[in-house]
Amino acid sequence: TADLRRCGLVCGVNPSLGQVDYYAYGPWENYSDRKDGCMIGRYADTVEGMEVAYVKPQSMGNREGLRELKLTGIDGKGICIQTEGQVSFSALRYTDEDMMNCNHMWELKPRPYIVLHLDAAMRGVGNASCGQDVDTLPAYQVPQKELSYKLRFTSCTKE
């Protein structure tokens, strides 16, 4: 399908695993065409801290270049995901559909689970803020070809 927004895996995760530790571009949200101001490194946050308070809800909280992700509880126990290949991720309390169907952030109702996206490709943001509708450049669109990555899931405990 042409013009996909993202291509990858989405799953629900136990809501008690709200501590997020990752090795990727950060510490702010970033996209393929919006990551020059971010650095590869290890960052820690919470699922709620990954939200961005946009005027209108939309996809948010993406991190590019993921190599390792730990989702843990306050006791330090949880899941560890190591990656191989291009992977981006987001961990939120909302689905994409939830965000597309609301006009204001206060209308969003948190899901009873964490919505985890692990994507092989995520469409860039593009730019329509300059008075002209400028689409996402082809280099930052989801390619129409076979995409693959490897994910290794293990349990993790406090180090």
Task: Describe these PLM feature segments.
Residues T1-E159:
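Beta-strand/loop-rich accessory regions of lumenal/periplasmic or secreted enzymes
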